[in-house]
């Protein structure tokens, strides 16, 4: 069922079938913003619990909560899409068909910084179709910096075009 979202004054019509990359980007930006809000509230409002995956990689309860939020929204909107997430499904070997739509997620990129109260962490979401990365979104909710890019169309910071340095 179609629905419309408005981001920075631009309306995007979101459909559950094959979508334009601009609509995928809009959806990913909405996800990143919601995930960023959860990152902030998890760190401000509760005691973070910690564990280690593979014995050495720090993972927090916030990593898992943000991962669950993003994954659930993608599955709800696109049940046929594959999700590759650092926290819940980190093994690329589990992705059998790279030609199908694929979401690549790092729910909290910079977990160590996040866990130690530093603001250098972000939500990272990418979308690939037919083996090619088409859309990338990175949000640092602490600095309100939302980076987004669409293959062949350049990159934006908070909706403004940016150039490679």
Q: Across the structure, where does each feature detected by a protein language model lie?
A:
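Glycine-rich active-site/cofactor-binding loop and its immediate structural neighborhood
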Residues: 101-131, 135
